[in-house]
Amino acid sequence: MFSKIFPPIHTEGYKFLVIAGFITLVLLFISGFLGTIGLLLTVWVYYFFRDPERVIIGDDNYLVSPADGEVIKVEEVDGPREVGLDNKKFKKISIFMNVFDCHVNRTPCSGKVEEILYKPGKFFNASLDKASEDNERNYYKLKDKSGNDIIVVQIAGLIARRIVCETNKNQELNQGDRIGMIRFGSRADVYYENYEPLVKIGQRTISGETLLAKK
């Protein structure tokens, strides 16, 4: 019960929490009002970096959401050329994470990480179409248990300025394992083949729990 109300935070959040706490103490010495603002900032930092446990279905017939957020795209596209799959057709689901969403990302399926590719870029609003091509991003090319290519792309946004990768090439992952996070508002794209989408535009998702697609 305690962990549900006060979930643990991601290690990336520790230094920000310390900084926010220090600022709060300084502001308290100046005035109670400013101290209250600092306290609210500290609470928000804790909330942003929260890393709650999730109930994972553990079923290879499904893909689960890699991110908390809102579905903004469900479409058929060419695969990402950055990982050499632009000669294949994929379905793609895009999920936008606002600054109040949990930003820890998880793998949609069990399988092997065949490639990880970081691409520097710009910081347009992550909800825009061009964010998939122009923004800073990190690609995870996975092979699921049936041999299907699954690609997860972490995309930095207007406020997000750092993509954190916690996964290694050739690593074997279980569905719902943490793969990294993006700081302060961002987007996750999932490219997949041989699954049918289960979500619609405007739907809210929970990382590791919401079923995105089914074989």
Give each language-model segment a name.
Residues 1-215:
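Contiguous, well-folded functional domains in the mature portion of proteins
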